[in-house]
Structure formats: C-alpha cells, structure tokens
C-alpha cells in the first residue's frame, strides 16, 4: 500500500506544476499584449499630432495666398456679391466689352490724349520765340525814353512819332505772334480731337480679372505677358466681329 500512495502524490505534484507554468505563460502573454497596445497607441498619437501640425501649416499658407490674391483683385470685384456673379441676366466676366469711339454725340466722356514729344517741342519753341520777340521791343523802349529827355522841340516830335510807330509795330508783332500761336494750338487741338475720335479702342479682360485698355496710341507699350489665353480668345472674337460688320457695311453700300 505504501508505494501506491507515493505514486499518487507524485502525479498530483506534477499536475500542479503544469498548471502553474501555464498560468505564468498567460500572465506574460497578457503583459506583452498590454505593452504592444500601449506602444501602438503612443505611436498613433504622435502621428496624429504631426498630421495636425502639418494641417495647421497648410491652412496658414492657404490663408496667406488667399489674402495676396484678394489684394491683387481689382476694387470693383471687392464690392460685388456672389449672387450677382451667379445671376444669369448679368454679363459674364469673360465677355468682350468693346467701344469703337467715332464722331458720335453718345460719347459722354471723350478720350483725353496726352501731347506727343513733337507737340511739346513745338510749344516750347513757340514760347521761346515769343519771349525772344518781347525782349528786343523792351530794349528799344529804353533808348527812346532817353532821347525824349535830351531832344529839343522839333526833335521830340520826330522821336515821339518814331516811338509811336515802333510801339504800334511791336503791338502788331505781338498780335501776329499770338494769332500764330493760337492758330497752331487750334490746329493741334483739332488734330488731336480728330485723332481721338477716329482712334479705335478695345477693352480686354484677362482670366485673372485684369482689365487691359488697347488702342493705337499705346500698342507699343502693352505688356504681351499679360495677354493670356482668355485675352487672346477675346481679341479673336473682336476680329471676327469687325470682319462681320465690315462685310455687312460693304454689302449695304453696294446695294
């Protein structure tokens, strides 16, 4: 009977050791899982913080770019509302707004043309000639006054007559110079007004909202880099419109 009891005790002790070993393995596995979950959550939180920082930087740059674009926009667009732009009755921004300004009473604000370099040089030359014509007349008046004081009765009459004649000649010269200056100015103004009335102009709107004023006077001063695809398309439409109207006028004149 003694050996049987020893076998049972040994079997019970072996079973308890196996259970304890499996329990310890479960505890270790749960601890590893907890550590893995904590590390994963920490890395995820760090990644979220980094993405939020990048998003804030991106929003700041977008805000700056938006403010710069608002500063570049013309003042007329600052006051317009979105519902006005979305209205179907209003004309679109890309449409061509063109005005051929000829001799017509409908023009309320005529074009103001700056004088050219030739006109400025001509006016400066006229002013110089008028100032030079005034200086010798004043130089002639001074000796006549001296001769009046030093002359006798007969000589004074002769000097007075010569003085009056010279004064009248000087006045005639002044009047003729003024008339010539007025005539030249009138011709220049009439020519400038005629040129302004007969000059063809066009207003082009680019895709960025910039309005370009095109005319024969400033055709060499236009920056070609500002003319984008929208502006070129508008100019092509203008050319087609002008060709159509010219052909229509020719047909009307032949009839």
Curated annotation (Swiss-Prot):
Compartmental location: Nucleus; Chromosome, Centromere
Keyword Cell cycle: yes
Keywords annotated in UniProt: Cell cycle, Cell division, Centromere, Chromosome, Mitosis, Nucleus
InterPro entries hit by this protein: Borealin_N, Cell_div_borealin
Description of how the protein assembles with itself and partners: Component of the CPC complex.
Record family assignment: Belongs to the borealin family.
Gene responsible for this protein: cdca9
Protein's recorded name: Borealin-2
BP GO terms, sorted: cell division
Function, in words: Component of the chromosomal passenger complex (CPC), a complex that acts as a key regulator of mitosis. The CPC complex has essential functions at the centromere in ensuring correct chromosome alignment and segregation and is required for chromatin-induced microtubule stabilization and spindle assembly.
Region (Disordered) location: 1-24, 107-156
Species annotation: Danio rerio (Zebrafish)
Bias type Polar residues, positions: 124-135
GO CC, alphabetical: chromosome, centromeric region; nucleus
């Amino acid at each position: 009977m003694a050996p049987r009891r020893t076998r049972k005790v040994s079997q019970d002790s072996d079973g308890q050791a196996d259970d304890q070993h499996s329990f310890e393995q479960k505890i270790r596995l749960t601890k590893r899982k907890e550590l893995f979950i904590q590390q994963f959550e920490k890395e995820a939180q760090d990644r979220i913080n980094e993405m939020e920082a990048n998003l804030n930087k991106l929003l700041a740059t977008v805000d700056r770019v938006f403010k710069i674009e608002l500063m570049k926009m013309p003042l007329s667009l600052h006051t317009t509302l979105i519902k006005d732009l979305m209205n179907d009755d209003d004309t679109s921004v890309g449409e061509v707004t063109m005005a051929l300004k000829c001799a017509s009473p409908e023009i309320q604000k005529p074009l103001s043309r700056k004088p050219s370099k030739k006109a400025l040089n001509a006016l400066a030359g006229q002013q110089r000639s008028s100032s030079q014509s005034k200086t010798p007349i004043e130089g002639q008046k001074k000796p006549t006054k001296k001769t009046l004081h030093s002359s006798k009765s007969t000589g004074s009459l002769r000097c007075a007559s010569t003085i009056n004649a010279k004064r009248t000649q000087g006045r005639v010269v002044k009047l003729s110079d003024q008339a010539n200056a007025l005539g030249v100015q009138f011709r220049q103004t009439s020519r400038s007004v005629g040129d302004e009335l007969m000059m063809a102009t066009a207003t082009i709107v680019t895709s960025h909202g910039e309005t370009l004023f095109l005319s024969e006077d400033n055709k060499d001063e236009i920056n070609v880099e500002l003319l984008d695809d929208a502006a070129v398309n508008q100019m092509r439409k203008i050319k087609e419109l002008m060709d159509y109207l010219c052909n229509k006028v020719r047909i009307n004149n032949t009839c």
